[in-house]
Curated annotation (Swiss-Prot):
It comes from the Bacteria. GO terms for cellular component: cytosol. One of its GO terms (molecular function) is ITP diphosphatase activity. Mg(2+) binds at E41, D70. The active site is at D70 (proton acceptor). This is dITP/XTP pyrophosphatase.
Length: 199
């Protein structure tokens, strides 16, 4: 059975394909295979609303089962920023490095580790052409470093250290990150549903 990932993000595609290896009956596609499709504008006020909107829109317009992800970094002491604007925190065309620099700038007065707590949040929405079927959430808690460390990962990974770990998400092996990430936690809550999903 085919499931379309509503993303063109190569990092996310690779991560999801790795997690889906346990489900031999599923074939994972991405929006790279549907270049004419136009994603809806993200107008939700939280990750859940955006994930559902992306999943339902693609499922309806492409007449397929669709799995959509909306995720980002939340810093409570910054009133939840960057939050749903994680990918475009420093501007619509901002690079990962520019987004990280803006985050560090906004956190420059937060010296104590307890003031630098943060968490990654992921919401996954699974939709069929007839509508939403399942929506789940995963969270990974940690804190923000004073400077970037590591070369793996993407986004804010080089600034984020998971609680009980010493290395940033960009310093640990990708396979390890994929076992402990917010996306993995959300995916595990979807696993039973995917296991029973058939054409």
């Amino acid at each position: 059975m085919e499931i379309l990932l509503a993303t063109t993000n190569l990092h996310k595609i690779r991560e999801f394909k790795e997690m889906c290896k346990a489900f031999a009956h599923l074939e994972i596609l991405s929006l790279h295979q549907f270049p004419a499709y136009m994603c809806p504008e993200e107008v939700g006020t939280n990750f859940k609303e955006n994930a559902i909107s992306k999943a339902e829109h693609a499922a309806k317009h492409l007449n397929r089962w669709v799995l959509a992800d909306d995720s980002g970094l939340v810093v409570p002491r910054l009133s939840g920023k960057p939050g749903i604007y994680s990918r475009r925190f420093a501007g619509l065309e901002a690079t990962d490095e520019e987004n990280r620099k803006k985050l560090l700038l906004e956190m420059r007065q937060l010296i104590n580790k307890e003031d630098r707590t943060a968490y990654y949040e992921c919401c996954l929405a699974l939709s069929s052409p007839t509508g939403l079927q399942k929506c789940v959430q995963g969270i990974c808690e940690g804190f923000i470093l004073n400077e970037a460390r590591g070369r793996n990962g993407f986004g804010y990974d080089s600034l984020f250290v998971k609680n009980d770990y010493e290395k940033s998400f960009a310093e640990i092996d990708e396979a390890v990150k994929n076992r402990i990430s917010h996306r993995r936690k959300a995916f595990e809550r979807l696993s039973a549903f995917l296991e029973n999903l058939r054409d």
